[in-house]
Regions:
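A compositional/structural signature marking long, glycine- and acidic/polar-rich segments
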Residues: 198-258
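Conserved donor-binding loop and adjoining core beta-sheet/short helix segment
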Residues: 44-49, 59-93
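A structural feature that tracks compact, well-ordered secondary-structure segments
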Residues: 60, 73, 137-138, 168-169, ...
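Core segments of cupin and vicinal oxygen chelate
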Residues: 23-66, 109, 115-117, 121-128, ...
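Vicinal oxygen chelate
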Residues: 1-11, 15-25, 46, 76-171, 192-210, ...
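Short beta-strand/turn micro-motifs at beta-sheet edges
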Residues: 6-9, 78-81, 152-155, 214-221
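Peripheral, non-catalytic segments flanking oxidoreductase cores
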Residues: 2-7, 69, 73-82, 140-141, ...
Length: 332
């Protein structure tokens, strides 16, 4: 599942992105966009375990493989988008080489505004999701071992191939640079003005972090249309425990290990204020649903099962798009 590990590089460096979690104000609209427009599979309908009367939903490849999982907290009562420093401000997805014009046309046909650019010698399409989160579609060749969604609205040869990168915006970059390179094992690869590119693990898509210094910008706040955190991969509990020790030794305030049922997590902030997580690859989303049924029902960890009836009445129903024809999807 995901990249193969040589067993020698951890905890010297995290191998890549595990998942990215953001905040949406309209879960149904969010599902319509990420499934119907971007062609990601809806792989899990669960709850935010810290605010259990709200959704935590997950998108990805057919299995939600680590390195593909874009997830959202459904918090409609939260304030609207307040993006700024101390946040992940852009999420990058990988699209296959040769798919650039396909995506330009697809987005135009779906009436989604986009812009085109070249960054570090790569072609980039920039769009925004319905809540305003900035997304990059970047051409590249990913080493992630994915399971394609055969029934998705995007042909497999053009489908999103997991994450490409995350962009962090910070008020002052040097402390973040030192932490990324000296503690987390990132390597600096390129620089363009205030943007510095780093990579980790085997390099390439799903391992890239761009750091943008913005001393004059406003501080970001947790709000609808912002990224809550980015999670980095650990192949197992042992590697995660090693990382926790290393981070504490580096002066980070790290949470205890938290069992999220689909993975185990530790959380901490890098010096620029961005919330990081290290999440285990296992057990994955098929722990409580078969692959073909992923996302079809409300999935709850065992310790929340006693609240299933109450939560089922509290949570607004989600309709998964099924009319996936000619690049369009409808849940209506």
């Amino acid at each position: 599942m995901g990249r193969e590990y040589d067993g020698l590089s951890l905890p010297a460096a995290v191998p890549g992105i595990h998942h990215v979690t953001s905040i949406t104000g309209d879960v149904q609209r969010n599902v319509d966009f990420y499934v119907g427009a971007l062609g990601l599979r809806f792989v899990k309908k669960s709850i935010n375990q810290d605010v259990p009367d709200t959704y935590h939903i997950y998108f990805g490849d057919y299995l939600g493989t680590p390195g593909t999982a874009m997830t959202f907290f459904g918090w409609p009562s939260w304030p609207k988008r307040r993006a700024g420093s101390g946040q992940v401000t852009t999420v990058g997805f990988t699209i296959p080489e040769g798919s650039f014009e396909f995506w330009v046309k697809r987005l135009r046909d779906l009436h989604i505004e986009s812009s085109r650019a070249t960054r570090f010698d790569g072609d980039v399409i920039t769009i925004h999701d319905p809540d305003g989160i900035e997304l990059d579609l970047v051409t590249g060749s990913s080493a992630l071992k994915l399971t394609p969604w055969p029934d998705g609205p995007v042909p497999n040869e053009h489908a999103i191939h997991g994450f490409h990168s995350v962009t962090l915006t910070v008020a002052e970059a040097q402390a973040s640079v030192d932490f990324l390179t000296k503690t987390m094992g990132f390597r600096q690869k390129a620089q363009d003005g205030r943007r510095t590119r780093f990579e980790t693990g085997g390099g390439g898509p799903d391992s890239i972090l761009d750091l943008v210094e913005s001393p004059e910008g406003p501080a970001g706040e947790e709000s609808i249309g912002t990224v809550h955190h980015v999670a980095w991969r650990a192949p197992d509990d042992k590697h995660q425990a090693d990382w926790r020790e290393k981070l504490i030794a580096a002066g980070r305030n790290v949470t205890p290990v938290i069992d999220r049922w689909y993975f185990k997590s530790i959380y901490y902030r890098e010096p620029g204020g961005v919330l990081f997580e290290i999440a285990t690859d296992s057990p994955g989303f098929t722990i409580d649903e078969k692959p073909g049924a992923l996302g079809s029902g409300l999935s709850l960890p065992p310790w929340f099962q006693v609240r299933r009836d109450t939560l089922g009445e509290t949570l607004t129903p989600i309709v998964i798009p099924t009319n996936l024809v000619q690049g369009r999807a409808s849940s209506r």
